[in-house]
């Protein structure tokens, strides 16, 4: 990988991991447009570690409080502070974890085509638009602390759909949150907290594959990938949460429709 490819792909991954757009669509589109080779598993691990560092650092107070209160709740066998939110993140992760174990092979073999990604980008983009319309009509939107266990499980099941390339994990979890009556910022915050265990699990599995495959590692590329994806992801989270209530989801929906259409034109000759 040359320096330009490292910079572009790391920044793209950092931005698209948390925006309600599809990271897989971008990682297919950019190499196709400029003729780059596949970035490789080691670089994928690096940029995921960068985005993980960004979201953990941004929500460091929440993560610390949830972790502390979760252990305290286990010791006291009662709810303590933010322990319920910690349990919510754990419960919301389970459906995606199960789906990943059951369908990982099928999805990698059958659903990673550019056309699947294009249609998923468009279809789930329209669902995001609909959920935002529903949210605007909700008289008293809730925050992430008010979710019932049923709500959490439904958002977790929605997150499992993100295994379909082109869906966008953040997009589909925000969609579910908005449809369940969360405010835009509440849906986004819970989506970002849910990303932490998912990124940990995905990075762990990829690291195992990397070790077992004895793949040569470009440590300079990995280091740059971690740093650049972390910076871009942190800035993305900050400005997205700052502007979300004002601009809503429509700009991202329009972008997804354009992106999906471009992929269709490039890969099917539409």
Swiss-Prot record:
It catalyses: di-trans,octa-cis-undecaprenyl diphosphate + H2O = di-trans,octa-cis-undecaprenyl phosphate + phosphate + H(+). Catalyzes the dephosphorylation of undecaprenyl diphosphate (UPP). Confers resistance to bacitracin. Its main location: membrane. The keyword Translocase does not apply. Its EC number is 3.6.1.27. It is an enzyme of class 3 (hydrolase). InterPro entries: UppP (IPR003824). The lineage of its organism: Bacteria, Pseudomonadati, Pseudomonadota, Gammaproteobacteria, Pseudomonadales. Pfam families: BacA (PF02673). The chain crosses the membrane at residues 1-21, 39-59, 87-107, 114-134, 147-167, 190-210, 221-241, 247-267. GO terms for molecular function: undecaprenyl-diphosphatase activity. Belongs to the UppP family. One of its GO terms (cellular component) is plasma membrane. It is found in: Cell inner membrane. It is a multi-pass membrane protein. Keywords: Antibiotic resistance, Cell inner membrane, Cell membrane, Cell shape, Cell wall biogenesis/degradation, Hydrolase, Membrane, Peptidoglycan synthesis, Transmembrane, Transmembrane helix. One of its GO terms (biological process) is response to antibiotic. Bacitracin is thought to be involved in the inhibition of peptidoglycan synthesis by sequestering undecaprenyl diphosphate, thereby reducing the pool of lipid carrier available. PANTHER family: UNDECAPRENYL-DIPHOSPHATASE. This is Undecaprenyl-diphosphatase 2.
């Amino acid at each position: 990988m040359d320096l330009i490819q490292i910079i572009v792909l790391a920044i793209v991954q950092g931005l698209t991991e948390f925006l309600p757009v599809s990271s897989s669509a971008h990682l297919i589109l950019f190499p196709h447009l400029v003729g780059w080779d596949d970035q490789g598993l080691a670089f994928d691990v690096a940029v995921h570690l960068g985005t993980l560092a960004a979201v953990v650092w941004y929500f460091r107070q929440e993560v610390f409080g949830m972790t502390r209160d979760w252990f305290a709740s286990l010791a006291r066998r009662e709810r303590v502070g933010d322990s319920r939110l910690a349990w919510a993140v754990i419960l919301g992760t389970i459906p995606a974890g199960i789906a990943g174990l059951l369908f990982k092979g099928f999805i990698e073999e059958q659903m990673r085509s550019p056309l699947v990604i294009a249609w998923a980008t468009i279809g789930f983009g329209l669902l995001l638009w609909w959920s935002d319309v529903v949210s605007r009509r909700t008289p008293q939107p809730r925050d992430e602390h008010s979710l019932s266990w049923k709500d959490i499980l439904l958002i977790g099941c929605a997150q499992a759909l993100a295994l379909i390339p082109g869906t966008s994990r953040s997009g589909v979890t925000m969609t579910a949150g908005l449809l369940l009556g969360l405010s835009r910022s509440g849906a986004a915050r819970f989506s970002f907290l849910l990303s932490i265990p998912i990124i940990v699990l995905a990075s762990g599995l990829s690291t195992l594959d990397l070790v077992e495959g004895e793949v040569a590692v470009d440590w300079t590329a990995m280091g740059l990938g971690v740093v650049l994806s972390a910076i871009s992801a942190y800035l993305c989270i900050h400005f997205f949460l700052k502007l979300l209530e004002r601009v809503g989801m429509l700009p991202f929906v329009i972008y997804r429709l354009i992106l999906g259409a471009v992929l269709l034109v490039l890969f099917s000759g539409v």
